[in-house]
């Protein structure tokens, strides 16, 4: 087995198949498993996907939300076991792959049109 085929086989076994398809502009609820000392709990992070990057095991996505008037962005590895589940709340209609322009918009200007 060549190195490339070996890497491909290991990568394929690590990919998650239970996640829904989503794109930048979609509103997600990401359920993240958090371990604090000996306790474990689920924390929900809800916001708009502003980017997806990479491929295979190293693929990541960034979710942005406004919390107490402050913009919070969190980047998650897509295939990590720390993600319990992902719910797609809304499908957004955007014409860009990276929605960095949302960082400078406030209030109603930062809304994204929904796909029906």
From Swiss-Prot:
Tagged with keyword Ribonucleoprotein: yes
Enumerate the InterPro entries for this protein. Ribosomal_bL19, Ribosomal_bL19_CS, Ribosomal_bL19_sf, Translation_prot_SH3-like_sf
Report the transmembrane regions from the record: none
Concerning PROSITE patterns, the annotation shows: RIBOSOMAL_L19
Q: List keywords of the entry alphabetically.
A: Ribonucleoprotein, Ribosomal protein
This entry's Gene Ontology molecular function terms read:
structural constituent of ribosome
Q: Which domain of life is it from?
A: Bacteria
Pfam families xref list: Ribosomal_L19 (PF01245)
Q: Which GO terms describe its biological process?
A: translation
One GO CC term, this protein? cytosolic large ribosomal subunit
Q: Is Ribosomal protein among this UniProt entry's keywords? A: yes
Similarity-based family: Belongs to the bacterial ribosomal protein bL19 family.
> Which purpose does this protein serve, as stated in its record?
This protein is located at the 30S-50S ribosomal subunit interface and may play a role in the structure and function of the aminoacyl-tRNA binding site.
**What name has this protein been given in UniProt?**
Large ribosomal subunit protein bL19
Q: Which gene encodes it?
A: rplS
